[in-house]
């Protein structure tokens, strides 16, 4: 699936991933391939990304919104 993380300053990440963990406002959650469509708010914390070549990346955010549809995740964050 494709993950795109956009901040006011730049595109922080864009690429193929196998899983992503988010700091949701109601608690952390993980999105895997073929996840049901979802829109959720995010709180301050870390986004943990597992890429298709099994590398882990972590990005700190202050909050934001995530949308997942058709195996594409878009995150708008601070």
Model-derived features: positions:
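Compact, glycine-rich, soluble single-domain proteins
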Residues: 2-78
């Amino acid at each position: 699936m494709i993950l795109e993380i956009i901040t006011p300053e730049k595109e922080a990440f864009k690429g193929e991933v196998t899983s992503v963990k988010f700091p949701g406002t109601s608690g952390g959650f993980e999105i895997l391939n073929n996840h049901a469509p979802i829109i959720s708010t995010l709180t301050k914390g870390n986004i943990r990304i597992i890429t298709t070549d099994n590398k882990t990346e972590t990005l700190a955010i202050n909050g934001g919104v995530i949308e997942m549809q058709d195996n594409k995740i878009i995150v708008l964050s601070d």
